[in-house]
């Protein structure tokens, strides 16, 4: 047995999650097998953020500190063999950001203890990481309870000489959600052509922006649901549900190096059309009476009014006039519904949309219509760095503090819109454990 048999930090009541502005109390525990002369015993509470240009590289190129406080627990002397406890207490700053860890950077809060020994003797050090969770109240975000709507019109040619257009409109019932809540999606597709469209796909995306020497964008697909295509000259309506899994909150107030955004992207490949809805993920839910999950088939649940061009181009108007007249919207069925498995390191297939990254000098735009995205399913994390030739896949999974990871992760997708209606209208938006 050595001279120092035990040297560790213990926090009061075994806590590991704290809120900004709270006191953090604990003690340094020391067990000695022989007398230990020392010059000083110190404890430090610190919080910082570091960002790297390379994935899983601890050599930070940019750092910022949030707090760094030290206490002297004992001055020069000698400790006899046996157990020794040195209590301490710090007050966490009210502006401390939420803990976060990703492949290109992290926000870490920790307590470090050290024993400075006389010259030619080995110093002793230990540390303990704790988590800070600064709850995001979604009700503090303006218009958070309002429906989220976006629309696009795509004009295209087919059969060499014919032209047509597709109007894609997507909406969600809210602009912000909490873990375990159901996101209700509605998409209206008006096919003003004689050609069938490809399937419509909705993806819940997470975009983490890291400010190193240049902005690095880490984008992953959290969940994806696919519906069928729309027949020629038809107006279709697609309604689906996505269960919000355990995710870090939107933004990271107090941190200027890492920013988190969420988007719901609804797209079709043929014709190529995409709409992107910015979303917020928070910790305190929106104060709103839940909407009915089962509006009548073909009827609008009040989420949106389909956007149709009031004055289409002449050739498009002629094409519409020559084609069949639109009837009431038909309901699209769902082909597949997938949710990312937790902390998986298996690489998924990557479908790349090559987009040149935009040079950004300030903070990344929170409501950009289309961030530089590369879509993937599963744990593959592609990213774009300025000047890079394309996306680079990584296998790092986001490390969530215990407050997040304690939620029941949805291994299975939530019921589809049709299934939820068939179950008698039971609300599936309950938080796990409630």
UniProtKB/Swiss-Prot annotation:
Free-text comment on this protein's domains from its UniProt entry: The PPxY motifs mediate interaction with WW domain-containing ubiquitin-protein ligases.
Motif PPxY motif 2 in this chain: 414-417
Ranges for region Disordered: 295-345
Physiological role: Functions as an adapter recruiting ubiquitin-protein ligases to their specific substrates. Through an ubiquitination-dependent mechanism plays for instance a role in the incorporation of SLC11A2 into extracellular vesicles. More generally, plays a role in the extracellular transport of proteins between cells through the release in the extracellular space of microvesicles. By participating in the ITCH-mediated ubiquitination and subsequent degradation of NOTCH1, negatively regulates the NOTCH signaling pathway.
GO MF annotation terms: arrestin family protein binding; identical protein binding; ubiquitin protein ligase binding; ubiquitin-like ligase-substrate adaptor activity
UniProt similarity note: Belongs to the arrestin family.
Major localisation: membrane
Name of the protein in question: Arrestin domain-containing protein 1
Signal peptide bounds: none
Cell membrane listed as a keyword: yes
Lineage of origin: Eukaryota, Metazoa, Chordata, Craniata, Vertebrata
Motif residue range(s): PPxY motif 1: 401-404
GO cellular component: cytoplasm; cytoplasmic vesicle; extracellular vesicle; plasma membrane
GO biological process: extracellular transport; extracellular vesicle biogenesis; negative regulation of Notch signaling pathway; protein transport; protein ubiquitination; ubiquitin-dependent protein catabolic process
Bias (Polar residues) ranges: 330-342
Keyword Signal listed: no
Record PTM text: Ubiquitinated. Ubiquitination by WWP2; promotes localization to extracellular microvesicles. Ubiquitinated by WWP1.
UniProt xrefs under InterPro entries: Arrestin-like_C (IPR014752), Arrestin-like_N (IPR011021), Arrestin_C-like (IPR011022), Arrestin_domain-protein (IPR050357), Ig_E-set (IPR014756)
Known partners and oligomeric status: Interacts (via PPxY motifs) with ITCH (via WW domains); the interaction is direct and participates in the recruitment of the ubiquitin-protein ligase ITCH to the NOTCH1 receptor. Interacts with ARRB1 and ARRB2; the interaction is direct. Interacts with TSG101; may recruit TSG101 to the plasma membrane. Interacts (via PPxY motifs) with WWP2 (via WW domains); ubiquitinates ARRDC1. Interacts with SLC11A2; controls the incorporation of SLC11A2 into extracellular vesicles through an ubiquitination-dependent mechanism. Interacts with WWP1 (via WW domains). Interacts with NEDD4 (via WW domains).
Keywords assigned: Cell membrane, Membrane, Ubl conjugation
Gene3D superfamilies: 2.60.40.640
PANTHER family, sorted: ARRESTIN DOMAIN CONTAINING PROTEIN (PTHR11188), ARRESTIN DOMAIN-CONTAINING PROTEIN 1 (PTHR11188:SF176)
Annotated coiled-coil segments of the chain: none
Pfam annotation, one family: Arrestin_C
Record localization: Cell membrane
């Amino acid at each position: 047995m050595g001279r120092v048999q035990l040297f560790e930090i213990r926090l009061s009541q075994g806590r590991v999650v704290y809120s900004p502005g709270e006191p953090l109390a604990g003690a340094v525990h020391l067990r000695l097998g022989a007398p230990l002369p020392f010059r000083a015993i110190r404890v430090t509470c610190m919080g910082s953020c570091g960002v790297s240009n390379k994935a899983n590289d601890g050599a930070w190129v940019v750092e910022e500190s949030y707090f760094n406080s030290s206490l002297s627990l004992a001055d020069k002397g000698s400790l006899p063999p046996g157990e020794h406890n040195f209590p301490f207490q710090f007050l966490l700053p009210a502006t401390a950001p939420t803990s976060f860890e990703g492949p290109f950077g992290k926000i870490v809060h920790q307590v470090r203890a050290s024993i400075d020994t006389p010259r030619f003797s080995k110093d002793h050090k230990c540390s303990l990481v704790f988590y800070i969770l600064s709850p995001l109240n979604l009700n503090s975000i303006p218009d958070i309870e309002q429906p989220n709507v976006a629309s696009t019109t795509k004009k295209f040619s087919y059969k060499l000489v014919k032209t047509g257009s597709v109007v894609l409109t997507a909406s969600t019932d809210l602009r912000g959600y909490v873990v375990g809540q159901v996101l209700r999606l509605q998409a209206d597709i008006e096919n003003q052509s004689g050609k069938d469209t490809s399937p419509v796909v909705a993806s819940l995306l997470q975009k983490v922006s890291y400010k190193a020497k240049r902005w690095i964008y880490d984008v992953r697909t959290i969940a994806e649901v696919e519906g069928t295509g729309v027949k020629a000259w038809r107006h279709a309506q697609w309604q689906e549900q996505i269960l919000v899994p355990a995710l870090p909150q939107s933004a990271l107030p107090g941190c200027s190096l890492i920013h988190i955004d969420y988007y719901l992207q609804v797209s079709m490949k043929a014709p190529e059309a995409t709409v992107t809805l910015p979303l917020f993920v928070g910790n305190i839910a929106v104060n709103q009476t839940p909407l009915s999950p089962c509006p009548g088939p073909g009827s609008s649940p009040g989420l949106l009014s389909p956007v149709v061009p009031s004055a289409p181009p002449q050739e498009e108007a002629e094409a519409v006039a020559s084609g069949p007249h639109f009837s009431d919207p038909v309901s699209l069925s769902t082909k597949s519904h997938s949710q990312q498995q937790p902390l998986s390191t298996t690489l998924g297939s990557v479908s790349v949309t090559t987009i040149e990254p935009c040079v950004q000098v300030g903070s990344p735009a929170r409501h950009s219509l289309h961030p530089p995205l590369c879509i993937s399913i599963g744990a593959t994390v592609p990213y774009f760095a300025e000047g890079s030739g394309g996306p680079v896949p990584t296998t790092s999974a986001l490390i969530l503090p215990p407050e997040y990871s304690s939620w029941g992760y949805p291994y299975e997708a939530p019921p589809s819109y049709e299934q939820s209606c068939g179950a008698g209208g039971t609300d599936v938006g309950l938080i796990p454990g409630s």
